[in-house]
Amino acid sequence: MTTQNRFRDNEIRAPQGTQLTAKSWLTEAALRMLMNNLDPDVAENPKELVVYGGIGRAARNWECYDKIVESLINLNDDETLLIQSGKPVGIFKTHSNAPRVLIANSNLVPHWANWEHFNELDAKGLAMYGQMTAGSWIYIGSQGIVQGTYETFVEAGRQHFGGSLKGRWVLTAGLGGMGGAQPLAATLAGACSLNIECQQSRIDFRLKTRYVDEQATDLDDALARIEKYTATGVAVSIALCGNAAEILPELVRRGVRPDMVTDQTSAHDPLNGYLPKGWNWEEYRQRAQHEPALVINAAKISMAEHVEAMLAFHNMGIPTFDYGNNIRQMAHDMGVIRAFDFPGFVPAYIRPLFCRGIGPFRWVALSGNPDDIYKTDAKVKALIPDDAHLHHWLDMARERIRFQGLPARICWVGLGQRAKLGLAFNEMVRSGELSAPVVIGRDHLDSGSVASPNRETEAMQDGSDAVSDWPLLNALLNTASGATWVSLHHGGGVGMGFSQHSGMVVVCDGSDEAAERIARVLHNDPATGVMRHADAGYDIAVNCAQEQGLNLPMVAATQGKKS
């Protein structure tokens, strides 16, 4: 059993420049990205190893963190480090094209895959919640979800408001590592937003990083600001310190009609992520240590009231959707029978992108030099010249998104495009156009890397929502393809028992060997998403598979029968 030492009063920042601490760029990349996850400009609570998402950690405790760092510094290019729930458990001889790190976080046998059992293991030092990109060392701050949220809002605007969100406003809550992307995403999509957050420190952080424009003093002030800005068609994001379980029902009582309603509180984790109404944060954290069952029940009662208010907006005909935090399930558990009457964001707005393998492609400049990102932005535009929507995103991102930690960029691209971009970035490193290598990764929220029946795989047309073979196959294939590190997690986004998901990162160090790995990984990884959706019978995915020349035996057989 590992001793629990989860607080250390220090500050971690990733090394920058071209001088290596580790033995190669492959292991240096993992080292820098682990440290970048805990940069105070990136992580939500770095002194306790918490990156984002309630208790999503980068390492199990500080002893484990120190050993991971030591292991990465000394790791050879024919060795692989194994990480078990944030703990380095072994180093094995493999080969140069094998991953340098393999990570498994938070995985439990299904019968025991619940928060109660996980929390027992966590308290004993036997487990760690890795969220999605916290424990897989590829979190890039709120930018990591901005474009996905932006794409969701834009598509909602197309479906419900004729393609424009000018003069419209979004009601939501949660300004943590994920939810903090919402105000900026809404602004970039052309909408105003009212963003409720119960911790003033999180509002302060989003104001500092320019993800939120203004803070209202109270609800009346917030509504007055919304009225003023929507009347003039100006997109401004407004934060309000308060509890969503109190404010949303009050808005319903007042007859206020937002144009769109969603939520990104950390409702997936009632013990650590959702403040019961009438409580303050300090009381919540203290009682969580001594009365966990009471705290969980109180949080879920408040979630039920929160969802009842969302249902009221839905029943008014207002577009209302779950943004993947499992709040509907929590409310349903508390007797809100119609909690699932409003949809999740993936089936409502995002699935057609997933069918083409399009998802959150991200890269990070290990040099620490922002110019390296700006040069790659230009390369993306040059290689994908006809996608005006993508170009608009990159322009807005450069203007509005402040880098957190190592400079990074995200853009949603799909099968075919990812490998093209990765190979181009590798060539830029080789030629010296970029000052140091870059890493390419993605969120676990992607087209072929997650099984999550209340989020990414909700309402699959063949009923395969809960089949989790797909993320396992994705992880295995990325390992076989030579990704630099591969991760397989449980419970990210929606909590214990509700998801399994995998991630990968590949390093562009300018070498021929890297080019071969990049070509394999960045083709095969999104191809598994097309495969998964084609197997479920989505015509968009079947057509994409045919266009891209994927060899999918059963899909080909099915198409043959149809013809």
UniProtKB/Swiss-Prot annotation:
Sorted alphabetically, which PROSITE patterns does this protein's record hold?
UROCANASE
| InterPro entries noted in UniProt | Urocanase, Urocanase-like, Urocanase_C, Urocanase_central_sf, Urocanase_CS, Urocanase_N, Urocanase_Rossmann-like, Urocanase_sf
* Cofactor binding note from Swiss-Prot or TrEMBL: Binds 1 NAD(+) per subunit.
Catalytic reaction equation(s): 4-imidazolone-5-propanoate = trans-urocanate + H2O
Q: Copy the pathway line from the protein's UniProt record.
A: Amino-acid degradation; L-histidine degradation into L-glutamate; N-formimidoyl-L-glutamate from L-histidine: step 2/3
Q: List the active site.
A: 411
Keywords of this entry: Cytoplasm, Histidine metabolism, Lyase, NAD
Recorded hits in HAMAP family, A to Z, give: HutU
Full protein name: Urocanate hydratase
Which taxonomic lineage does the organism of this UniProt entry have?
Answer: Bacteria, Pseudomonadati, Pseudomonadota, Gammaproteobacteria, Enterobacterales
